[in-house]
């Protein structure tokens, strides 16, 4: 199997996706999706460039200059993406080996720092030919050594370094440089989703020189990247400014002079900022401002995007009452998801979902979910069973003084957190004290286990059970901050990855979801939609037919002023 740029009979660029059959959020990539995209006229302009491993806007005749103003919560705990720094803020300065294609709405995977790749027939070896002429922002020439150093740090981080994506790369046996411009990944077992992992904006390539100089720890270092934009200014909790990289390896890009990432934590303020012209776009805004923008089609674009992020209250299973699975199961049963979703509906659209989100063919249908204990609207029997479990665990009279960590995002601290707090008190007499923490610093509390319960928005690279499970649910997983351990689930995840047919995977996935319901690591509120809005003057990002929500790079953007 291969992806290789080669001349076509007509002399143009032709990309071959031979047998790759990569799937992303239920959308076929490769030849099948390229054929379907031929019906989308605006995309045709950019297809040849994308196939050659270059990103181009879907509209012809892009204009140069100007600044793109993006509003969202742009804070980050530190500057190291591998250790959990904010990819949505930092990714613009970096590249990965591959990426999702901006010109077709993120439906296909195309080269980034690679120029071509080959996949062995047994799907155990992925060999990447690297792009020549690439330099980091400090002038250091990019090579295979940088790729090996970056991914080795993800897969087997040195002592004292936290790799948040270590778990999802657990199938990688080794990564090696075959020569200065060729890298090979060898897997322990085939993983159909491996290219999707590499395309995640967080899995970027750092300079080996900078990693070595800082002993692998870049938390306090604004490390030079290879990306289309380079660092200019950062005012914490206010804004980032990144300016055009004049030496970017793709000389056509970027069109913008700079991008401004403006810290707007409140979703209503983000939407109002776009509507008033103070912002050019926001990745996720409040429902009421999105509805207003959707009505004003001459001025604004709006899209509701499927998202593999969810709202969940994570349990610290290593201490106190939440160490008892009966208490966790009681909360799973007693709290009304319907009430939580309704309380939040003016802010964000949350779906009634189980542990596999919609968009994955193995997700439980909504009508079936609505009849399950814990998920059904009628809570009478669920609360009775929950109280029985609490009594068996020794908490018939409730629990006092749980530490409930909630981010300083207004909708979390003022709506969803208090709604969950009230439900615990009313149904099970569980008292918890809400502790507000800065959103960017919340991950550090989680990594240290400094919580009893924590409201967060865990996101995943894709909707596959193996990716989700290996990142957050498997014993010892790199993002399993609550210390959850379930031998039954671990075994099912291993079975799931070894399954070779859809029927086998469906059977094991169903058993895994049942195991999570019986012994939940979280209270899962539900997976969400993101409400994207932009001014119509913003071009080049194919927002109107984007396949899913990704708060990622924007180098093909241009302003039609």
What is the predicted role of each segment?
Residues 129, 164-211:
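Surface-exposed binding/hinge segments that line
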Residues 72-89, 113, 140, 194-203, ...:
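A structural "hinge/loop" feature
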Residues 1-22, 33-36:
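N-terminal secretory signal peptides
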Residues 69, 143-150, 180-186, 227-228, ...:
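Alpha-helical secondary-structure segments
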């Amino acid at each position: 199997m291969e992806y290789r740029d080669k001349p076509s009979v007509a002399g143009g660029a032709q990309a071959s996706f031979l047998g790759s059959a990569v799937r992303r959020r239920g959308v076929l990539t490769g030849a099948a999706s390229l054929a379907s995209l031929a019906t989308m006229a605006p995309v045709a302009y950019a297809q040849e460039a994308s196939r050659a491993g270059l990103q181009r806007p879907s509209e012809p005749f892009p204009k140069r200059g100007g600044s793109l103003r993006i509003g969202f919560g742009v804070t980050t705990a530190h500057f190291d993406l591998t250790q959990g720094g904010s990819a949505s803020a930092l990714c613009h300065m970096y590249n990965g080996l591959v990426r999702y294609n901006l010109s077709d709405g993120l439906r296909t995977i195309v080269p980034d720092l690679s120029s071509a790749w080959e996949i062995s027939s047994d799907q155990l070896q992925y060999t990447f030919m690297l792009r020549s002429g690439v330099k980091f922002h400090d002038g250091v020439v990019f090579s295979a050594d940088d790729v090996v150093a970056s991914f080795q740090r993800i897969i087997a981080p040195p002592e004292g370094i936290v790799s948040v994506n270590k778990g999802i790369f657990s199938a990688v046996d080794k990564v090696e440089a075959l020569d200065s411009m060729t890298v090979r990944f060898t897997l322990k077992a085939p993983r159909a989703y491996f290219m999707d992992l590499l395309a995640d904006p967080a899995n970027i390539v750092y300079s080996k020189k900078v990693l070595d100089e800082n002993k692998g720890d870049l938390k306090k270092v604004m490390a030079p990247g290879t990306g289309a934009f380079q660092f200019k200014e950062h005012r914490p909790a206010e804004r980032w400014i990144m300016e055009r990289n004049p030496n970017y390896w793709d000389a056509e890009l970027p069109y913008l002079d700079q991008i401004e990432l403006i810290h707007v934590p409140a979703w209503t303020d983000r939407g109002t900022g776009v509507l008033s012209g103070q912002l050019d776009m926001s990745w996720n805004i409040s429902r009421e401002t999105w509805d207003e923008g959707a009505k004003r089609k001459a001025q604004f674009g709006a899209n509701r995007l499927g998202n593999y992020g969810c709202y969940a209250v994570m349990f610290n299973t290593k201490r106190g009452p939440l160490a008892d699975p009966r208490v966790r199961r009681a909360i799973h049963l007693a709290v009304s998801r319907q009430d939580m979703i309704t309380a939040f509906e003016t802010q964000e659209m949350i779906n009634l979902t189980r542990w596999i989100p919609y968009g994955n063919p193995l997700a439980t249908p909504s009508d079936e979910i609505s009849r399950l204990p814990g998920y059904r609207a009628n809570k009478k029997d669920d609360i009775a069973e929950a109280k029985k479990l609490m009594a068996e665990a020794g908490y018939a009279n409730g629990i006092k003084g749980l530490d409930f960590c909630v981010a300083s995002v207004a909708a979390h601290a003022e709506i969803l957190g208090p709604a969950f707090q009230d439900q615990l008190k009313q149904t099970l007499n569980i008292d918890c004290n809400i502790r507000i923490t800065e959103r960017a610093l919340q991950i550090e509390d989680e990594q240290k286990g400094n919580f009893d319960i924590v409201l967060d928005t865990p996101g995943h690279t894709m909707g596959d059970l193996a990716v989700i499970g290996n990142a957050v649910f498997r014993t010892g997983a790199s993002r399993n901050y609550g210390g959850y351990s379930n031998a039954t689930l671990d075994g099912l995840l291993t079975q799931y990855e070894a399954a070779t047919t859809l029927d086998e995977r469906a059977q094991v996935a169903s058993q895994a979801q049942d195991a999570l319901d019986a012994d939940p690591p979280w209270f899962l509120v539900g997976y969400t939609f993101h409400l994207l809005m932009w001014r119509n003057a913003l071009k080049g990002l194919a927002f109107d037919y984007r396949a899913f929500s990704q708060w990622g790079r924007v180098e093909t953007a241009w302003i039609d002023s």
